[in-house]
Swiss-Prot record:
This is ATP-dependent Clp protease proteolytic subunit. GO terms for biological process: protein quality control for misfolded or incompletely synthesized proteins. Belongs to the peptidase S14 family. It comes from Enterococcus faecalis (strain ATCC 700802 / V583). One of its GO terms (cellular component) is cytoplasm. Keywords: Cytoplasm, Hydrolase, Protease, Serine protease. It catalyses: Hydrolysis of proteins to small peptides in the presence of ATP and magnesium. alpha-casein is the usual test substrate. In the absence of ATP, only oligopeptides shorter than five residues are hydrolyzed (such as succinyl-Leu-Tyr-|-NHMec, and Leu-Tyr-Leu-|-Tyr-Trp, in which cleavage of the -Tyr-|-Leu- and -Tyr-|-Trp bonds also occurs). It comes from the Bacteria. Its EC number is 3.4.21.92. Coiled coil: none annotated. GO terms for molecular function: ATP-dependent peptidase activity; ATPase binding; serine-type endopeptidase activity. Gene3D superfamilies: 2-enoyl-CoA Hydratase, Chain A, domain 1 (3.90.226.10). Fourteen ClpP subunits assemble into 2 heptameric rings which stack back to back to give a disk-like structure with a central cavity, resembling the structure of eukaryotic proteasomes. It is found in: Cytoplasm.
Length: 197
């Protein structure tokens, strides 16, 4: 059962009830929680585009608590984060793993945060193939190309040499918030929201 809290606001014109995500959107906050698939990506992309059209001078806050998911869905979010004019601040609470950590790192440099007990995990993309040998070969080439593309972006976003990224993403690589800061995945570990601009 998916329970979404409702917030009631009072105004001179009476009461208005919002689901919690709509209320957060009024404050330019987008929640990315759970596995990243096409539906989640479409929702996040629509919210990014809406907030940017509303005011491209104000920052957008993307809160992440995700185990990762689809590479293509995640890259669609990544491209949209770069496409919008507004700066996108990223904040991990809980976990940012796999594509979740990739999107955390995609935030505006200087505005990528983690709460003290957050976990961040990077690794290479996962995939599988079946069918004729030629189809398997095509799929294998595609996942190797995808790995190279993701590693190149991570190297650029973290400042780490590509060889270090390749080594460190070869297996699941878990980091604390402090370790993620030292690595360059985030810019600050924050205790409270006063660090946000």
């Amino acid at each position: 059962m998916n329970l979404i809290p409702t917030v009631i606001e009072q105004s001179s014109r009476g009461e208005r009830a919002y689901d919690i995500y709509s209320r957060l959107l009024k404050d330019r906050i987008i929640m990315l929680s759970g596995p990243i698939d096409d539906n989640v990506a479409n929702s996040v992309i629509a919210q990014l585009l809406f907030l940017d059209a509303q005011d491209s001078e104000k920052d957008i806050y993307l809160y992440i608590n995700s185990p990762g998911g689809s590479v293509s869905a995640g890259l669609a979010i990544f491209d949209t984060m770069n496409f919008v004019k507004a700066d996108v601040q990223t904040i991990v609470l809980g976990m940012a793993a796999s594509m979740g950590s990739f999107l955390l790192t995609a935030g505006q440099k200087g505005k990528r945060f983690a709460l003290p007990n957050a976990e961040i995990m990077i690794h290479q993309p996962l995939g599988g193939a079946q069918g004729q040998a030629t189809e398997i070969e095509i799929a294998a080439r595609h996942i190797l190309d995808t790995r190279q593309r993701l590693n190149s972006i991570l190297a650029e976003r973290t400042g780490q040499p590509i060889e270090v990224i390749e080594r460190d993403t070869d297996r699941d690589n878990y980091m604390t918030a402090e370790q993620a800061k030292e690595y360059g995945l985030i810019d600050e570990v924050m205790e409270n929201s006063s660090a946000l601009n």
